[in-house]
Amino acid sequence: MTDSLIHTGPFLVAALYHFVSVPRFASLQAPLQALSEENGVKGTLLLAHEGINGTIAGPDAGIHAVLAFLRAQPEFARLEHKESRASKMPFLRMKVKLKKEIVTMGVEDIDPNKVVGTYVAPRDWNALISDPDTIVIDTRNDYETAIGTFRGALDPKTKTFREFPDWVRRNTGLHNKPKVAMYCTGGIRCEKATAFMKAEGFDEVYHLKGGILKYLEEVPQEESLWEGACFVFDERVSVEHGLKEGEHRLCHACRNPITSEEITSPLYEEGVSCSHCYHTRTEEDRLRYRQRQLQIALARKRGQRHIGS
């Protein structure tokens, strides 16, 4: 299934994941890497026993070639993906990695291929999260929720997805309402989170199909309950309604998204510090970052891209 393009740009970006048993996943690494490189495709794909996850970008024909290869594999015949556009290549290289999990929760025996929550289409999401009997949970990390979230959602303020299970177990009040609705960027974390919640005894568990990205694509801004921008894991940094590129930039010292206002802060120095990390880094750290930033600037003058940029 291919979702429609919303924003124009020379590079096609495809976000995908699929939970499915793939005992032979390691055998797909080399052909995927070679095919991607041959077609000018960059990004990251994770392969594991439980499926595939990743985001890739490149020319239209290249992306279509990689997706066609994947769907030619019996396990991925029903693979869905979401498309958007980027004004410049958002990745530096292509990486196909073998993993224990395609999204790391760190809890044994959680299998979304066997037990999972109920999908909710973007057009039905507003009604669900507006229901007073529903607890809404953002399953993303704190640096993501800082720039955008659904109105009224609980923010676990996790640093990594591995912290989510402990947060759930500590917050016994989550059982006080009959319905739990969860969401994430593209759908993979909240899907795995629903499998965990079911295992923890929650009965009515729902998750946003296609994640925030699909919601921002399909739901008109005037009807939207989304507030802010959606963090994405590439050089676009964020996207907004209609999946157009957002205005956030990334602090390359701490990897936090920063606004245009934060760039004017006296604590901001490109590639070296921002208001999020200035007080948690040492002068030695900043000296090292300045040296890296100098190498990036020199690479730009040569018309190249530094690997650390």
Swiss-Prot record:
Any Pfam family hit: Rhodanese
EC number annotated for this UniProt entry: 1.14.-.-
Record flagged with keyword tRNA processing: yes
Keywords: Oxidoreductase, tRNA processing
Catalytic reaction annotation: uridine(34) in tRNA + AH2 + O2 = 5-hydroxyuridine(34) in tRNA + A + H2O
Signal peptide: none
Molecular function GO labels: oxidoreductase activity, acting on paired donors, with incorporation or reduction of molecular oxygen
Domain Rhodanese per the UniProt entry, residue ranges: 130-224
InterPro entries membership: Rhodanese-like_dom, Rhodanese-like_dom_sf, TrhO, TRHO_N
Alphabetical list of PANTHER family matching this protein: RHODANESE-LIKE DOMAIN-CONTAINING PROTEIN 7-RELATED, THIOSULFATE SULFURTRANSFERASE/RHODANESE-LIKE DOMAIN-CONTAINING PROTEIN 2
Functional summary from the UniProt entry: Catalyzes oxygen-dependent 5-hydroxyuridine (ho5U) modification at position 34 in tRNAs.
Family: Belongs to the TrhO family.
Name this polypeptide is given: tRNA uridine(34) hydroxylase
Organism listed in the record: Rhizobium etli (strain ATCC 51251 / DSM 11541 / JCM 21823 / NBRC 15573 / CFN 42)
Protein's gene: trhO
